[in-house]
Amino acid sequence: MSIKVKNITKQFGSQKALNNVSFSVNRPEIVGFLGPNGAGKSTMMKILTTYLSPTSGNAEVNGHAVSNQQKQVQKSVGYLPEHNPLYLDQYVREYLRFNANVYNVDKSRVEEVIELTGLTPEAHKTIGQLSKGYRQRVGLANALLHNPEVLILDEPTTGLDPNQLVDIRQLIKSLGKDKTVFLSTHIMQEVEAMCDRVIIINKGEIVADKKLSELREGQEQTVIVEFDYRVEDAFLLKLPHAKSVKNVHDFIYEIVFDTTTDMRAHVFDFAHDNELKILQLNQKNASLESLFRELTS
């Protein structure tokens, strides 16, 4: 396991930011750490990067304990914090060369990460002259300098425009082919675009830890059906497993079933038996956003 967290609790006074959290992340794997604001995402990442100590519990990164092997952990981790600390008066290349010296990394690696993160046309500028998106790239380049086995990225796509989003997503996906990438976000589309697996945290506790495909299993199913005339909601509730019915427009109904079995054939048979004509019949896939709301509301 590249990351192993066991029974981590972090308390600030009387408030528990994390409550008995356990999970693991393999290599290579891209895992999205998803949760609403204040759920404990950044706190967990600061513990994994040794910037915070847990109140109780244990965590390991590449086999090194965050509690007493901080230097070994830091050598194996590339960290992009949520609020990316940069020296705005330094030039991009100068800043990266300075940090390369800290890591005892050859200067040639600086040019590699500049090219890898798309910073070549901006490398001659001061960081203060860069847009928010390019500053994020500088932070990511810095995290990659020492070629770490584990990347911990806190809200890595914050402030990026649509074109920059595509570039950074592609970069993170390519890095995830041979590294462990653990990234936090509250944007569902980011998880669906980049991640193999999702861990959802709410109020300091893990509420889901599954592959995206598995997360959708066991959820409700919604069928959209249009008839040629109005049908009473109570009548449609006679369908097996029907949980709720909503008349969304004219003769179009949204029927929610408490099963993952495809219910379209049942709706068709029900309509046929009751001499109802169907004009359209579709299955509405549950979005990660709706599942997120369900798990964190």
In which residue ranges do the predicted regions lie?
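Beta-strand-connecting loop/turn residues
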Residues: 1, 14, 250-251, 275
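ABC transporter nucleotide-binding domains
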Residues: 2-5, 10-202, 206-208
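Residues at or immediately flanking beta-strands
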Residues: 58, 126, 222, 277-280
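Hydrophobic alpha-helical segments typical of transmembrane helices
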Residues: 76, 95, 109, 211, ...
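Alpha-helix N-cap/helix-start and coil->helix boundary motif
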Residues: 93, 188, 230-233, 261, ...
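Surface-exposed charge patches
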Residues: 98, 112, 234, 269, ...
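ABC transporter nucleotide-binding domain
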Residues: 167-256
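C-terminal coupling/interaction segments
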Residues: 259-297
